[in-house]
Amino acid sequence: MASQEATSQATPQKIVVASLNPVKTGAVLEGFTRMFPGGAYQVSGVSVPSDVPDQPLSDQETLQGALNRIKNARSLEPDADFWVGVEGGVNPEGEAFQSFAWIAVESKEGRTGKARTATYYVAQETANLIGGGMELGHADDLIFGKTNSKQHSGSVGILTDDVVTRTSYYIQAVILALIPFKNTQLTFSSNKSG
């Protein structure tokens, strides 16, 4: 289990991210810190399955992967304050593929927040490999001569020359997924998982 912390005088809230990927745990820590400044957080990652294909091929499949990751992380680490699922996916559009990710957050009280990142098109060379069954990260590594790019800048970082990194790409969606937790007096339809 990997762990990162942002500390203050308060007892840290325990946040379990359903991934060991440091990009995802870092984005979650930064999102919580920006949305709730002054809080104390202990973020750890756990390896759990998404129960969807390694490369989700639709919006719904990708969202379901994020929600499944929360469920599986909660089973593994039931004593957290929050569980977060981050699932990247692609959506076919003819021969092209749009790339995006879903972020889902659930509190120990059962409140849920969900948000999707911005969407961009992957290069056709990458799309051809995805269409042949390859995962986006592996396709990018092959096309761009990288190694394990999904734990660094990711596809979005490669294509933007790190103007947008995979971490910065996720942070905004983490913040948006936290809206129901910032506005507890309001009701959001995303408060129901699934």
Segments the model singles out, each with a brief description of its role:
Residues 2-80:
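N-terminal polybasic phosphate/anion-binding patch
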Residues 54-194:
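Anionic-ligand binding patches
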